[in-house]
Amino acid sequence: LRRVRVRHVGALEDDALAEELRQRTQVLCIVNNRRHARALFDAIAEQPGAHHLTTLMHARHRIAALTRVREELKAGRPCRLVAPSWIEAGVDGDFPTALRAEAGLDSVAQAAGRCNREGRRPTEASEVLVFSPVNWQPPQELKVFTEVFREIARTHSGDLLAMEAIHAYFQRLYRRLGDNLLDHEATLTQLRTADRGGQ
C-alpha cells in the first residue's frame, strides 16, 4: 500500500464531487450505496469514459463493463468509474486516483488497492481521497466504522495506512463495538464447535 497516498479531504457536496470526477481523466469513485453511485454517474454521464456499476446489473453486463474499464485504463483513455462499495472486493482495475466515501479504514485500504495497483506510477501521482459526502449519510451499519475512521484521520493524517494507524483503528473499533461483535475467542470457540459437528 506504499504505492499510494491517502488523504482525508473533508466534506464534499455532490456538485463538487462530480467536478472532481470531470477534472480527472482516469478516476474511480466508491460510495456507500447504489443510489448515491447512480446520482453521481448521472451528473457525469456526458463525460468521456463515464461508467457506472451496480449489483442490479446482470452479471454478464457487469463483466462487460469491467472489461471496457480495464481496456480504457490500459490504453490510457478516459475512464471515470462510479460504483458502490462492492467493487472493492475482487475488481482488479488500476486507477491513478480513487475517491472514497468515508467508511471503515479497512474499506479505505481496499480502495487503495484499486489505485496504482501495478506500481507503475510514482506514489505522489497516486492518491486516494477520502471524503465525507454532504448529501448522503452513511448507512446505519457503517456509522460506527465511519466515526472511528474520522478519529483516526485526525490523529494519523500523515499516513492513514501506517501500521500504527491500522492498529489504532481496530483498537478503537473494538472498544466501540464491544466483545460481542469483535470477540476473537468466541469466534474461535464457534469454529471449533462447528468443526466437531456442532457438539
Language-model-detected regions and their locations in the chain:
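Short His-Asn-centered micro-motif
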Residues: R3, H8-V9, V31-N32, A83-P84, ...
